[in-house]
Amino acid sequence: MRLSMRRALLAAGLALALVLAVHLGQRVLECQAVLGGPRGPRRTMRPEQEDLMMVGADHVEYRYGKAMPLIFVGGVPRSGTTLMRAMLDAHPEVRCGEETRIIPRVLAMRQAWSKSGREKLRLDEAGVTDEVLDAAMQAFILEVIAKHGEPARVLCNKDPFTLKSSVYLSRLFPNSKFLLMVRDGRASVHSMITRKVTIAGFDLSSYRDCLTKWNKAIEVMYAQCMEVGRDKCLPVYYEQLVLHPRRSLKVILDFLGIAWSDAVLHHEDLIGKPGGVSLSKIERSTDQVIKPVNLEALSKWTGHIPGDVLRDMAQIAPMLARLGYDPYANPPNYGNPDPIVINNTHRVLKGDYKTPANLKGYFQVNLNSTSSHLGSS
């Protein structure tokens, strides 16, 4: 099993390297043509004006470029990123779609090239400057986001670990906005462990280790969010989104500059429908977001974390207190839910919501296997 997984990762890495090589090769040739050859006089390149054009099923033409207001949704896995993107997908003007998985990998590679002084020197010597790399990254990311789903007026990407690169992405796409999903780390970690959601570097046999890694990841993402600025990055608390969906979504849509639609409150009604919410058959959150917003998962972690970890919680995960959570509250008081959420929860517990026909036969396989969310450390 390990060998086949390594081979799969190696194959994915080689494929990714090939795609990037093609993009970079094109950019280098363009640069050399504009700059007068590989050793010609250096001049500032003209900014590209080319847009990506797509035609929707309604025969409407959509044009996408680096100046468009992209939306990036991210956070530590198991923090409500799938729920958030499903709600946005329910909006008639927005399309997020499933995780691409490839965008955070590409961003991690770009970061690695920048951190290595020797590698950067080699790239610069070869004419693969930061300008060339950034143009290639911009084109590649936009192409993946635009073409992995149906076109829409507003495009959104949900890959949890992309928000470790918010500052860089805001440079590539200056009008983009970011939604950082924040959830009580104890709940996120309990969900990872019980649902066996493997994440690079997280030891799923240890609450202490996972909480330490959660703290490190959310610290990086939160710092990036603050650096980008409150006008471009909005922390969204999962608990408040669940308890008060209408109030929270009004704030979110106002922040994004998108008109209100009641459809965002009923994402479960639009699953699998044209122009609605497309769900992956293999993502671990799919079996949860087919249901309406409910309280089922809010405090499931209470009573499961070892006593020694609870005792040291403030030291293990100092970001809990920084984000406004009481590290010693067990169970915590997140607030009182809206009546609609209470009603939804009663209906979910009664079993009113069934798996859509197009998704049946996959969840049991998923729950008995592992799923990797790879993030740069």
Swiss-Prot record:
Post-translational modification: N-glycosylated.
Pfam families recorded: Sulfotransfer_3
Species annotation: Bos taurus (Bovine)
UniProt site positions, description: Transition state stabilizer: K158, S285
Superkingdom, taxonomy of origin: Eukaryota
Topological type in the membrane: Single-pass type II membrane protein
GO terms for MF: protein-tyrosine sulfotransferase activity
Membrane-side (Lumenal) residue stretches: 26-377
Subunit structure: Homodimer. Can also form heterodimers with TPST1.
Protein name per Swiss-Prot or TrEMBL: Protein-tyrosine sulfotransferase 2
Glycosylation sites per record: N343, N368
Binding locations of 3'-phosphoadenylyl sulfate: 78-82, 183, 191, 195, 238, 285-294, 300
Physiological role: Catalyzes the O-sulfation of tyrosine residues within acidic motifs of polypeptides, using 3'-phosphoadenylyl sulfate (PAPS) as cosubstrate.
Positions of the UniProt region annotated as Interaction with peptide substrate: 101-105
Subcellular location: Golgi apparatus membrane
Intrachain S-S bonds: C96-C156, C225-C233
Regions crossing the membrane: 9-25
Cellular component terms per the entry's GO annotation: Golgi apparatus; Golgi membrane
Family stated for the protein in its record: Belongs to the protein sulfotransferase family.
Cytoplasmic compartment spans: 1-8
Catalytic reaction annotation: L-tyrosyl-[protein] + 3'-phosphoadenylyl sulfate = O-sulfo-L-tyrosine-[protein] + adenosine 3',5'-bisphosphate + H(+)
EC class: transferase
Lineage: Eukaryota, Metazoa, Chordata, Craniata, Vertebrata
Keywords attached to this entry: Disulfide bond, Glycoprotein, Golgi apparatus, Membrane, Signal-anchor, Transferase, Transmembrane, Transmembrane helix
